[in-house]
Amino acid sequence: VTSDKAVCGTDPAPARLTVGIVSAGRVGSALGAALERAGHVVFGVSGISDASVYRARTRLPDSEILPAEEVARRAELLLLAVPDSELAGLVSGLATADAVRPGTIVAHTSGANGIGVLAPLTARGALPLAIHPAMTFTGHDEDVSRLGNACFGITAADDIGYAIAQSLVIEMGGEPVRVAEEHRTLYHAALAHGSNHLVTLILDAVEALRAALAGPGLLGQQLVDDQPGGLAERVLAPLASAALDNALRRGPSALTGPVARGDVDAVAAHLNALESTDAELAAGYRALSLRTAQRARTNPALLELLASPSDRRDAAEGSDQAKEGN
């Protein structure tokens, strides 16, 4: 229950709340466990899939597994932790069923959405919050502990809402960061670009390393195979970890390597070697090398090498038109 001071606006931090979660997926169950550690009571969760039910029983053993509408009706803090594509439909359904009481704190965990998606419930007296953990969740035990190192993008309707969201995030061990409603999509795109695409980059590099390391090795050397955590990953890990650390701490000065140096011959050789291994992997290398070259403001000849055939064709046509104009 929210304290009387919070209602008056003098102390907006939430007291111990009765929490309901829809649904008990990777994110919802992890946040629920973190809220319980802070002293809140997660009375109930909804879970449809076997995996969600298992996570609920494992991470939140004292919580009942209930239909979403019943969870919503009984909650003082309702946490909507469903995929982005399902959020608007869930909110609409709860509003139509009149399942959320006035005064209920309703928070969703979507990165791309602000509080606008909660408008049907806000119109019925709910207090809307967007609380997105900038963290990847695997469903394993480390999810909850990782929240202690995570920032949360929060959006609210007013100062009271921001204070409540901030307090909840701090209680879960995270760091709250204010994100304007109109910037939520950009915020989410940036995080997806820096995390999801990083995984693809690493997997591509591992694939190329496996091909490069295949064949006879040193006495006692681990054989190269397709299993995660193998030799290719061990070779790449220190370099990739150092590169990420340098990029986060030093910015553009962390750029090194043949693209940053403008070494056309080395990059051309890389492209040829990668093409013989996997054309799609080579295309990814070309695209990222071009972006790297643009950031490094490197050798124009390298930019020309890395430009796509259509870009080179457009540039040539533009040059021809300029000559004709003269």
What is each model feature region?
Residues 1-73:
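NAD(P)+-binding Rossmann beta1-loop-alpha1 motif at the extreme N-terminus of oxidoreductases
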Residues 18, 40-44, 75-78, 102-106, ...:
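Short active-site oxyanion
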Residues 29, 33, 37, 58, ...:
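Short, well-ordered alpha-helices that flank and scaffold nucleotide-derived cofactor binding pockets
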Residues 38, 56-59, 121, 142-246:
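Internal alpha-helical scaffold of NAD(P)-dependent oxidoreductase catalytic cores
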Residues 50, 54, 58-60, 64-142:
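Rossmann-like NAD(P)(H) cofactor-binding subdomain of soluble oxidoreductases
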